[in-house]
Amino acid sequence: MTTALEEQNAQQAATAGRVVRVIGAVVDVEFPRGELPALYNALTVEVTLESVKKTVVLEVAQHLGDNLIRTIAMAPTDGLVRGAAVTDTARPISVPVGDVVKGHVFNALGDCLDDVSLNNNPEIERWGIHREPPSFDQLEGKTEILETGIKVIDLLTPYVKGGKIGLFGGAGVGKTVLIQEMITRIAREFSGTSVFAGVGERTREGTDLFLEMEEMGVLQDTALVFGQMDEPPGVRMRVALSGLTMAEYFRDVQNQDVLLFIDNIFRFTQAGSEVSTLLGRMPSAVGYQPTLADEMGVLQERITSTKGRSITSLQAVYVPADDYTDPAPATTFAHLDATTELDRSIASKGIYPAVNPLTSTSRILEPAIVGERHYEVSQRVIGILQKNKELQDIIAILGMDELSEEDKITVARARRIERFLGQNFFVAEKFTGLPGSYVPLTDTVDAFERICNGDFDHYPEQAFNGLGGLDDVEAAYKKLTGK
Protein backbone atom coordinates (compact mmCIF):
# COMPACT_ATOMS: atom_id res chain seq x y z
CA MET A 1 0.00 0.00 0.00
CA THR A 2 2.83 2.38 0.91
CA THR A 3 4.63 1.62 -2.36
CA ALA A 4 1.52 2.37 -4.43
CA LEU A 5 1.03 5.68 -2.57
CA GLU A 6 4.68 6.65 -3.17
CA GLU A 7 4.31 5.89 -6.90
CA GLN A 8 1.16 8.03 -7.07
CA ASN A 9 2.88 10.94 -5.30
CA ALA A 10 5.90 10.66 -7.63
CA GLN A 11 3.63 10.67 -10.67
CA GLN A 12 1.78 13.76 -9.42
CA ALA A 13 5.11 15.52 -8.81
CA ALA A 14 6.37 14.73 -12.31
CA THR A 15 3.07 15.65 -13.99
CA ALA A 16 3.48 19.32 -13.24
CA GLY A 17 1.58 20.96 -16.10
CA ARG A 18 -1.74 20.87 -17.91
CA VAL A 19 -2.85 21.74 -21.44
CA VAL A 20 -4.86 24.97 -21.63
CA ARG A 21 -5.10 25.50 -25.40
CA VAL A 22 -4.57 23.46 -28.58
CA ILE A 23 -4.44 25.09 -32.02
CA GLY A 24 -3.08 22.62 -34.54
CA ALA A 25 0.60 22.03 -33.81
CA VAL A 26 0.71 24.80 -31.17
CA VAL A 27 -0.05 23.70 -27.61
CA ASP A 28 -0.15 26.11 -24.64
CA VAL A 29 0.63 24.56 -21.26
CA GLU A 30 0.23 25.97 -17.74
CA PHE A 31 2.76 25.06 -15.04
CA PRO A 32 2.82 25.87 -11.30
CA ARG A 33 4.72 29.00 -10.34
CA GLY A 34 8.47 28.36 -10.16
CA GLU A 35 8.31 25.10 -12.16
CA LEU A 36 8.38 26.45 -15.73
CA PRO A 37 10.49 24.24 -18.02
CA ALA A 38 13.43 25.79 -19.87
CA LEU A 39 13.26 26.72 -23.55
CA TYR A 40 13.82 23.71 -25.86
CA ASN A 41 12.92 21.24 -23.09
CA ALA A 42 10.94 18.22 -24.26
CA LEU A 43 7.54 17.71 -22.62
CA THR A 44 5.40 14.60 -22.91
CA VAL A 45 1.63 14.19 -22.84
CA GLU A 46 -0.43 11.02 -23.12
CA VAL A 47 -3.13 11.06 -25.82
CA THR A 48 -5.89 8.51 -26.40
CA LEU A 49 -7.46 8.38 -29.85
CA GLU A 50 -9.91 5.62 -30.80
CA SER A 51 -8.81 3.53 -27.80
CA VAL A 52 -5.16 3.77 -28.88
CA LYS A 53 -2.75 5.42 -26.47
CA LYS A 54 0.28 7.34 -27.68
CA THR A 55 2.81 9.76 -26.23
CA VAL A 56 3.12 13.14 -27.92
CA VAL A 57 6.34 15.10 -27.45
CA LEU A 58 6.13 18.91 -27.19
CA GLU A 59 9.11 21.26 -27.44
CA VAL A 60 9.06 24.49 -25.44
CA ALA A 61 9.23 27.46 -27.82
CA GLN A 62 8.10 30.50 -25.80
CA HIS A 63 7.42 31.67 -22.25
CA LEU A 64 4.19 33.69 -22.44
CA GLY A 65 4.00 34.92 -18.83
CA ASP A 66 1.41 34.08 -16.15
CA ASN A 67 2.99 30.60 -15.84
CA LEU A 68 2.07 29.78 -19.44
CA ILE A 69 4.41 28.33 -22.06
CA ARG A 70 3.85 27.81 -25.77
CA THR A 71 5.07 24.57 -27.32
CA ILE A 72 5.33 23.01 -30.76
CA ALA A 73 4.03 19.44 -31.08
CA MET A 74 6.31 16.82 -32.62
CA ALA A 75 3.36 14.64 -33.67
CA PRO A 76 -0.24 15.21 -34.77
CA THR A 77 -2.34 16.57 -31.90
CA ASP A 78 -5.50 14.60 -32.76
CA GLY A 79 -7.14 13.51 -29.50
CA LEU A 80 -5.29 16.05 -27.32
CA VAL A 81 -7.71 17.87 -24.99
CA ARG A 82 -7.61 20.77 -22.54
CA GLY A 83 -6.66 19.70 -19.05
CA ALA A 84 -4.44 16.83 -20.19
CA ALA A 85 -1.49 16.25 -17.86
CA VAL A 86 1.93 17.29 -19.20
CA THR A 87 5.31 16.03 -17.93
CA ASP A 88 8.54 18.01 -18.18
CA THR A 89 11.43 15.67 -19.05
CA ALA A 90 13.88 18.40 -17.88
CA ARG A 91 16.05 17.86 -20.96
CA PRO A 92 15.86 18.64 -24.69
CA ILE A 93 14.95 16.15 -27.39
CA SER A 94 17.74 13.57 -27.57
CA VAL A 95 18.85 10.95 -30.09
CA PRO A 96 20.94 7.76 -29.78
CA VAL A 97 24.59 8.05 -30.80
CA GLY A 98 27.45 5.68 -31.55
CA ASP A 99 27.87 2.59 -33.72
CA VAL A 100 24.40 1.39 -32.72
CA VAL A 101 22.81 3.92 -35.12
CA LYS A 102 24.58 2.56 -38.22
CA GLY A 103 22.36 0.63 -40.60
CA HIS A 104 19.15 1.90 -39.02
CA VAL A 105 16.42 4.46 -39.71
CA PHE A 106 15.37 6.95 -37.03
CA ASN A 107 12.83 9.74 -36.70
CA ALA A 108 13.65 13.22 -35.41
CA LEU A 109 12.96 12.14 -31.81
CA GLY A 110 15.55 9.36 -31.98
CA ASP A 111 13.06 6.49 -32.21
CA CYS A 112 14.31 3.64 -34.39
CA LEU A 113 11.77 2.83 -37.10
CA ASP A 114 13.19 -0.48 -38.36
CA ASP A 115 14.20 -2.10 -35.03
CA VAL A 116 12.02 -1.15 -32.05
CA SER A 117 14.30 -3.08 -29.67
CA LEU A 118 16.64 -0.06 -29.79
CA ASN A 119 13.98 2.25 -28.36
CA ASN A 120 13.93 3.08 -24.64
CA ASN A 121 17.14 1.10 -24.12
CA PRO A 122 18.96 2.68 -21.13
CA GLU A 123 22.29 1.18 -22.24
CA ILE A 124 22.34 3.25 -25.44
CA GLU A 125 23.96 6.67 -25.05
CA ARG A 126 21.85 9.66 -26.12
CA TRP A 127 22.83 13.26 -26.85
CA GLY A 128 20.57 16.31 -26.83
CA ILE A 129 20.06 17.83 -30.28
CA HIS A 130 20.67 21.43 -29.15
CA ARG A 131 24.44 21.76 -28.77
CA GLU A 132 27.09 24.47 -28.93
CA PRO A 133 29.36 24.62 -32.02
CA PRO A 134 33.07 23.82 -31.53
CA SER A 135 35.05 26.63 -29.91
CA PHE A 136 37.49 28.70 -31.97
CA ASP A 137 40.60 26.94 -30.67
CA GLN A 138 39.18 23.53 -31.69
CA LEU A 139 38.74 24.42 -35.36
CA GLU A 140 40.97 22.97 -38.08
CA GLY A 141 42.58 25.54 -40.38
CA LYS A 142 43.96 23.13 -43.00
CA THR A 143 42.27 22.98 -46.41
CA GLU A 144 42.15 19.65 -48.23
CA ILE A 145 40.37 18.40 -51.37
CA LEU A 146 37.76 15.65 -51.05
CA GLU A 147 38.27 13.61 -54.21
CA THR A 148 34.94 12.23 -55.42
CA GLY A 149 35.91 10.52 -58.67
CA ILE A 150 33.24 12.58 -60.48
CA LYS A 151 35.03 14.51 -63.23
CA VAL A 152 32.96 17.68 -63.38
CA ILE A 153 33.11 18.13 -59.60
CA ASP A 154 36.79 17.32 -59.08
CA LEU A 155 37.93 19.52 -61.98
CA LEU A 156 35.67 22.58 -61.83
CA THR A 157 34.05 22.72 -58.38
CA PRO A 158 36.31 20.70 -56.04
CA TYR A 159 34.81 19.84 -52.68
CA VAL A 160 36.50 20.77 -49.41
CA LYS A 161 37.12 18.03 -46.87
CA GLY A 162 35.26 19.25 -43.81
CA GLY A 163 33.44 21.88 -45.85
CA LYS A 164 29.84 22.61 -46.70
CA ILE A 165 28.67 21.92 -50.24
CA GLY A 166 25.34 22.99 -51.69
CA LEU A 167 23.57 21.13 -54.51
CA PHE A 168 21.26 23.72 -56.05
CA GLY A 169 18.52 23.02 -58.52
CA GLY A 170 14.82 23.02 -59.23
CA ALA A 171 12.56 19.99 -59.06
CA GLY A 172 13.64 16.85 -60.89
CA VAL A 173 17.18 17.80 -62.02
CA GLY A 174 19.01 15.15 -59.98
CA LYS A 175 19.87 16.51 -56.51
CA THR A 176 18.85 13.37 -54.63
CA VAL A 177 20.52 11.07 -57.17
CA LEU A 178 23.81 12.95 -56.79
CA ILE A 179 23.55 12.67 -52.99
CA GLN A 180 22.88 8.92 -53.25
CA GLU A 181 25.89 8.59 -55.55
CA MET A 182 28.12 10.44 -53.08
CA ILE A 183 27.01 8.16 -50.22
CA THR A 184 27.91 5.14 -52.35
CA ARG A 185 31.30 6.54 -53.38
CA ILE A 186 32.30 7.54 -49.86
CA ALA A 187 31.37 4.11 -48.50
CA ARG A 188 33.23 2.29 -51.32
CA GLU A 189 36.34 4.43 -51.69
CA PHE A 190 36.94 5.68 -48.14
CA SER A 191 35.01 3.22 -45.93
CA GLY A 192 33.67 6.34 -44.24
CA THR A 193 30.66 6.86 -42.01
CA SER A 194 27.71 8.77 -43.45
CA VAL A 195 24.63 10.28 -41.84
CA PHE A 196 21.63 11.07 -44.03
CA ALA A 197 19.00 13.55 -42.81
CA GLY A 198 15.82 13.51 -44.88
CA VAL A 199 14.18 16.88 -44.22
CA GLY A 200 10.64 17.30 -45.48
CA GLU A 201 11.09 15.18 -48.60
CA ARG A 202 8.89 12.43 -50.04
CA THR A 203 8.40 9.33 -47.88
CA ARG A 204 8.69 7.18 -51.02
CA GLU A 205 12.18 8.58 -51.68
CA GLY A 206 13.25 7.68 -48.15
CA THR A 207 12.03 4.12 -48.57
CA ASP A 208 13.74 3.80 -51.96
CA LEU A 209 17.00 5.16 -50.51
CA PHE A 210 16.95 2.66 -47.64
CA LEU A 211 16.30 -0.31 -49.94
CA GLU A 212 18.88 0.79 -52.53
CA MET A 213 21.58 1.29 -49.90
CA GLU A 214 20.81 -2.13 -48.44
CA GLU A 215 21.02 -3.64 -51.92
CA MET A 216 24.37 -1.97 -52.67
CA GLY A 217 25.92 -2.98 -49.34
CA VAL A 218 26.57 0.52 -47.96
CA LEU A 219 23.77 0.65 -45.38
CA GLN A 220 25.94 -0.74 -42.57
CA ASP A 221 28.08 2.44 -42.67
CA THR A 222 25.16 4.88 -42.75
CA ALA A 223 22.65 6.23 -40.25
CA LEU A 224 19.40 7.60 -41.66
CA VAL A 225 17.16 10.14 -39.92
CA PHE A 226 13.85 11.13 -41.49
CA GLY A 227 11.29 13.85 -40.89
CA GLN A 228 9.24 13.68 -44.05
CA MET A 229 6.61 15.74 -45.85
CA ASP A 230 3.64 14.34 -43.95
CA GLU A 231 5.03 15.21 -40.51
CA PRO A 232 4.35 18.36 -38.44
CA PRO A 233 6.59 21.40 -39.03
CA GLY A 234 8.29 20.96 -35.65
CA VAL A 235 9.65 17.57 -36.75
CA ARG A 236 10.84 18.88 -40.11
CA MET A 237 12.56 21.79 -38.37
CA ARG A 238 14.44 19.54 -35.91
CA VAL A 239 15.37 16.49 -37.99
CA ALA A 240 18.48 18.17 -39.45
CA LEU A 241 19.73 18.83 -35.90
CA SER A 242 19.06 15.18 -34.98
CA GLY A 243 21.16 13.93 -37.89
CA LEU A 244 23.89 16.47 -37.17
CA THR A 245 24.07 15.35 -33.52
CA MET A 246 24.71 11.75 -34.60
CA ALA A 247 27.46 12.97 -36.95
CA GLU A 248 29.03 15.09 -34.18
CA TYR A 249 29.43 12.01 -31.99
CA PHE A 250 31.38 10.17 -34.70
CA ARG A 251 33.58 13.27 -35.14
CA ASP A 252 34.15 14.23 -31.51
CA VAL A 253 34.17 10.87 -29.70
CA GLN A 254 35.27 8.35 -32.34
CA ASN A 255 37.58 10.82 -34.14
CA GLN A 256 36.15 9.91 -37.56
CA ASP A 257 35.76 11.90 -40.76
CA VAL A 258 32.02 11.95 -41.36
CA LEU A 259 29.79 12.87 -44.27
CA LEU A 260 26.48 14.52 -43.45
CA PHE A 261 23.86 14.59 -46.19
CA ILE A 262 20.86 16.89 -45.82
CA ASP A 263 18.03 16.53 -48.32
CA ASN A 264 16.54 19.14 -48.46
CA ILE A 265 17.83 22.22 -46.64
CA PHE A 266 15.05 24.34 -48.20
CA ARG A 267 12.47 22.23 -46.34
CA PHE A 268 14.30 23.09 -43.10
CA THR A 269 13.78 26.76 -43.89
CA GLN A 270 10.19 26.12 -44.95
CA ALA A 271 9.42 24.31 -41.69
CA GLY A 272 10.95 27.20 -39.73
CA SER A 273 8.66 29.57 -41.60
CA GLU A 274 5.61 27.47 -40.67
CA VAL A 275 6.64 27.32 -37.01
CA SER A 276 7.30 31.07 -36.96
CA THR A 277 3.82 31.76 -38.34
CA LEU A 278 2.22 29.38 -35.84
CA LEU A 279 3.99 31.23 -33.02
CA GLY A 280 2.56 34.53 -34.27
CA ARG A 281 5.78 36.21 -35.39
CA MET A 282 5.65 38.94 -38.02
CA PRO A 283 6.96 37.53 -41.33
CA SER A 284 9.83 39.17 -43.21
CA ALA A 285 10.70 39.15 -46.94
CA VAL A 286 8.59 36.81 -49.13
CA GLY A 287 6.82 35.52 -46.01
CA TYR A 288 9.86 33.87 -44.43
CA GLN A 289 10.51 33.97 -40.68
CA PRO A 290 12.39 37.02 -39.31
CA THR A 291 14.87 34.60 -37.66
CA LEU A 292 15.83 32.90 -40.97
CA ALA A 293 19.51 33.88 -40.92
CA ASP A 294 19.86 33.01 -37.22
CA GLU A 295 18.29 29.55 -37.57
CA MET A 296 20.45 28.77 -40.59
CA GLY A 297 23.57 29.91 -38.73
CA VAL A 298 22.79 27.74 -35.68
CA LEU A 299 22.72 24.66 -37.93
CA GLN A 300 25.59 25.52 -40.26
CA GLU A 301 28.10 26.63 -37.59
CA ARG A 302 28.02 23.16 -36.02
CA ILE A 303 29.01 21.58 -39.35
CA THR A 304 32.77 22.08 -39.32
CA SER A 305 36.21 20.48 -39.02
CA THR A 306 37.94 20.18 -35.68
CA LYS A 307 41.58 19.25 -35.22
CA GLY A 308 42.21 15.89 -36.89
CA ARG A 309 38.60 15.11 -37.84
CA SER A 310 35.81 16.59 -39.88
CA ILE A 311 32.17 16.70 -40.87
CA THR A 312 31.76 17.26 -44.60
CA SER A 313 28.23 18.26 -45.48
CA LEU A 314 26.38 17.90 -48.78
CA GLN A 315 23.12 19.80 -48.75
CA ALA A 316 20.51 19.61 -51.46
CA VAL A 317 18.91 23.03 -51.89
CA TYR A 318 15.61 23.22 -53.74
CA VAL A 319 15.36 26.55 -55.56
CA PRO A 320 11.71 27.71 -55.70
CA ALA A 321 10.74 28.41 -59.32
CA ASP A 322 14.50 28.37 -60.17
CA ASP A 323 14.75 31.81 -58.48
CA TYR A 324 18.18 32.13 -56.84
CA THR A 325 17.28 35.49 -55.28
CA ASP A 326 14.70 33.80 -53.03
CA PRO A 327 15.76 34.38 -49.38
CA ALA A 328 15.96 30.64 -48.58
CA PRO A 329 18.68 29.66 -51.11
CA ALA A 330 20.30 33.11 -50.82
CA THR A 331 20.76 32.67 -47.04
CA THR A 332 22.24 29.21 -47.57
CA PHE A 333 24.81 30.54 -50.09
CA ALA A 334 26.61 32.52 -47.38
CA HIS A 335 27.64 29.37 -45.49
CA LEU A 336 28.89 27.22 -48.37
CA ASP A 337 32.45 26.39 -49.46
CA ALA A 338 31.35 25.03 -52.83
CA THR A 339 28.16 25.24 -54.87
CA THR A 340 27.11 22.72 -57.48
CA GLU A 341 24.27 24.04 -59.62
CA LEU A 342 22.21 21.46 -61.46
CA ASP A 343 20.78 22.94 -64.64
CA ARG A 344 17.57 21.87 -66.35
CA SER A 345 18.90 22.84 -69.81
CA ILE A 346 21.88 20.47 -69.36
CA ALA A 347 19.63 17.68 -68.08
CA SER A 348 17.46 18.15 -71.19
CA LYS A 349 20.50 17.26 -73.32
CA GLY A 350 20.76 13.92 -71.52
CA ILE A 351 24.01 14.91 -69.76
CA TYR A 352 24.17 13.67 -66.15
CA PRO A 353 25.13 14.84 -63.60
CA ALA A 354 23.54 18.00 -65.01
CA VAL A 355 26.11 20.30 -63.38
CA ASN A 356 26.39 23.79 -64.86
CA PRO A 357 30.18 24.33 -65.02
CA LEU A 358 29.85 28.10 -65.56
CA THR A 359 27.75 28.85 -62.47
CA SER A 360 29.08 26.23 -60.03
CA THR A 361 31.83 27.52 -57.73
CA SER A 362 34.39 26.41 -55.17
CA ARG A 363 36.48 28.57 -52.86
CA ILE A 364 39.46 26.19 -53.15
CA LEU A 365 39.75 26.38 -56.95
CA GLU A 366 42.96 28.40 -56.81
CA PRO A 367 46.59 27.50 -57.63
CA ALA A 368 47.80 27.55 -54.02
CA ILE A 369 45.42 24.72 -53.08
CA VAL A 370 44.69 22.59 -56.17
CA GLY A 371 48.00 23.23 -57.92
CA GLU A 372 48.99 25.31 -60.98
CA ARG A 373 48.25 22.64 -63.59
CA HIS A 374 44.80 21.74 -62.25
CA TYR A 375 43.88 25.43 -62.03
CA GLU A 376 45.11 26.21 -65.56
CA VAL A 377 43.24 23.26 -67.11
CA SER A 378 40.03 24.19 -65.28
CA GLN A 379 40.28 27.79 -66.52
CA ARG A 380 40.88 26.62 -70.10
CA VAL A 381 37.81 24.38 -69.90
CA ILE A 382 35.67 27.20 -68.47
CA GLY A 383 37.01 29.60 -71.13
CA ILE A 384 36.06 27.24 -73.98
CA LEU A 385 32.59 26.65 -72.54
CA GLN A 386 32.04 30.39 -71.97
CA LYS A 387 33.09 31.22 -75.54
CA ASN A 388 30.76 28.53 -76.85
CA LYS A 389 27.88 30.04 -74.86
CA GLU A 390 28.60 33.49 -76.34
CA LEU A 391 28.56 32.05 -79.87
CA GLN A 392 25.19 30.30 -79.48
CA ASP A 393 23.18 33.38 -80.53
CA ILE A 394 25.21 33.73 -83.74
CA ILE A 395 24.83 30.01 -84.46
CA ALA A 396 21.07 30.17 -83.86
CA ILE A 397 20.64 33.11 -86.27
CA LEU A 398 23.28 32.56 -88.97
CA GLY A 399 24.38 28.96 -88.53
CA MET A 400 27.79 27.35 -87.99
CA ASP A 401 29.03 28.29 -91.48
CA GLU A 402 29.28 31.98 -90.53
CA LEU A 403 31.79 31.30 -87.75
CA SER A 404 35.54 31.72 -88.20
CA GLU A 405 37.65 28.56 -88.35
CA GLU A 406 38.95 29.26 -84.85
CA ASP A 407 35.43 29.61 -83.46
CA LYS A 408 34.33 26.41 -85.20
CA ILE A 409 37.16 24.54 -83.44
CA THR A 410 36.17 26.13 -80.11
CA VAL A 411 32.53 25.06 -80.52
CA ALA A 412 33.53 21.52 -81.49
CA ARG A 413 35.81 21.18 -78.46
CA ALA A 414 33.14 22.66 -76.19
CA ARG A 415 30.63 20.06 -77.36
CA ARG A 416 33.11 17.27 -76.61
CA ILE A 417 33.88 18.78 -73.20
CA GLU A 418 30.17 19.09 -72.37
CA ARG A 419 29.59 15.42 -73.13
CA PHE A 420 32.74 14.27 -71.35
CA LEU A 421 31.67 16.16 -68.21
CA GLY A 422 28.81 13.66 -67.98
CA GLN A 423 29.50 10.38 -66.22
CA ASN A 424 27.91 7.02 -65.53
CA PHE A 425 26.87 6.61 -61.87
CA PHE A 426 26.93 3.52 -59.67
CA VAL A 427 23.39 4.20 -58.42
CA ALA A 428 22.10 4.52 -62.00
CA GLU A 429 23.50 1.18 -63.24
CA LYS A 430 20.15 -0.60 -63.10
CA PHE A 431 18.54 2.15 -65.22
CA THR A 432 21.28 2.78 -67.78
CA GLY A 433 22.83 -0.68 -67.96
CA LEU A 434 26.27 1.00 -67.78
CA PRO A 435 28.62 0.30 -64.84
CA GLY A 436 29.54 3.27 -62.65
CA SER A 437 33.02 4.75 -62.95
CA TYR A 438 35.50 6.36 -60.55
CA VAL A 439 37.99 8.65 -62.32
CA PRO A 440 41.07 9.71 -60.28
CA LEU A 441 41.72 13.46 -60.22
CA THR A 442 45.06 13.17 -62.05
CA ASP A 443 43.38 11.25 -64.90
CA THR A 444 40.63 13.88 -65.07
CA VAL A 445 43.12 16.75 -65.39
CA ASP A 446 45.14 14.83 -68.03
CA ALA A 447 42.02 14.03 -70.08
CA PHE A 448 40.66 17.58 -70.20
CA GLU A 449 44.10 19.02 -70.94
CA ARG A 450 44.35 16.75 -73.99
CA ILE A 451 40.83 17.68 -75.15
CA CYS A 452 41.68 21.39 -74.83
CA ASN A 453 44.90 20.79 -76.78
CA GLY A 454 42.92 19.28 -79.65
CA ASP A 455 44.22 15.71 -79.33
CA PHE A 456 40.69 14.38 -79.89
CA ASP A 457 39.39 16.83 -82.49
CA HIS A 458 39.07 13.95 -84.98
CA TYR A 459 36.98 11.84 -82.58
CA PRO A 460 33.18 11.93 -83.08
CA GLU A 461 31.20 13.66 -80.31
CA GLN A 462 29.30 10.45 -79.56
CA ALA A 463 32.53 8.88 -78.28
CA PHE A 464 32.42 11.20 -75.24
CA ASN A 465 28.83 10.58 -74.10
CA GLY A 466 28.41 9.83 -70.36
CA LEU A 467 31.62 7.87 -69.93
CA GLY A 468 34.36 7.50 -67.33
CA GLY A 469 37.98 8.11 -68.32
CA LEU A 470 39.85 8.26 -71.62
CA ASP A 471 39.98 4.45 -71.82
CA ASP A 472 36.19 4.48 -72.23
CA VAL A 473 36.51 7.16 -74.93
CA GLU A 474 39.05 5.06 -76.84
CA ALA A 475 36.78 2.01 -76.60
CA ALA A 476 33.76 4.01 -77.80
CA TYR A 477 35.82 5.46 -80.68
CA LYS A 478 36.87 2.01 -81.85
CA LYS A 479 33.29 0.78 -81.63
CA LEU A 480 31.95 3.75 -83.61
CA THR A 481 34.61 3.71 -86.32
CA GLY A 482 35.34 -0.01 -86.44
CA LYS A 483 39.07 0.71 -86.12
Curated annotation (Swiss-Prot):
Q: Name one Pfam family in it.
A: ATP-synt_ab
Top EC class for this record: translocase
Q: Which reaction does it catalyse?
A: ATP + H2O + 4 H(+)(in) = ADP + phosphate + 5 H(+)(out)
Kindly give the membrane topology term recorded for this protein: Peripheral membrane protein
Do you know which InterPro entries this protein is assigned to? AAA+_ATPase, ATP-synt_VA_C, ATP_synth_F1_bsu, ATPase_a/bsu_AS, ATPase_alpha/beta_chains, ATPase_F1/V1/A1_a/bsu_N, ATPase_F1/V1/A1_a/bsu_N_sf, ATPase_F1/V1/A1_a/bsu_nucl-bd
Bilayer-crossing residues are none
| Superkingdom | Bacteria
Annotated Gene Ontology cellular components are: plasma membrane; proton-transporting ATP synthase complex
The record's GO molecular-function terms, alphabetically, read: ATP binding; ATP hydrolysis activity; proton-transporting ATP synthase activity, rotational mechanism
Question: Major place of localization?
Answer: membrane
Query: What are the protein's UniProt keywords?
Result: ATP synthesis, ATP-binding, Cell membrane, CF(1), Hydrogen ion transport, Ion transport, Membrane, Nucleotide-binding, Translocase, Transport
The compartments listed are:
Cell membrane
At which positions is ATP bound? 169-176
Q: What is its EC number?
A: 7.1.2.2
Subunit structure of this chain's protein: F-type ATPases have 2 components, CF(1) - the catalytic core - and CF(0) - the membrane proton channel. CF(1) has five subunits: alpha(3), beta(3), gamma(1), delta(1), epsilon(1). CF(0) has three main subunits: a(1), b(2) and c(9-12). The alpha and beta chains form an alternating ring which encloses part of the gamma chain. CF(1) is attached to CF(0) by a central stalk formed by the gamma and epsilon chains, while a peripheral stalk is formed by the delta and b chains.
Question: Sorted alphabetically, which PANTHER family does this protein's record hold?
Answer: ATP SYNTHASE (PTHR15184), ATP SYNTHASE SUBUNIT BETA, MITOCHONDRIAL (PTHR15184:SF71)
- Describe the family membership recorded for this protein in Swiss-Prot or TrEMBL: Belongs to the ATPase alpha/beta chains family.
- What is the role of the protein in this entry? Produces ATP from ADP in the presence of a proton gradient across the membrane. The catalytic sites are hosted primarily by the beta subunits.
Query: What is the name of the protein in this document?
Result: ATP synthase subunit beta
* Species name: Corynebacterium glutamicum (strain R)
Could you tell me the gene encoding this protein?
atpD
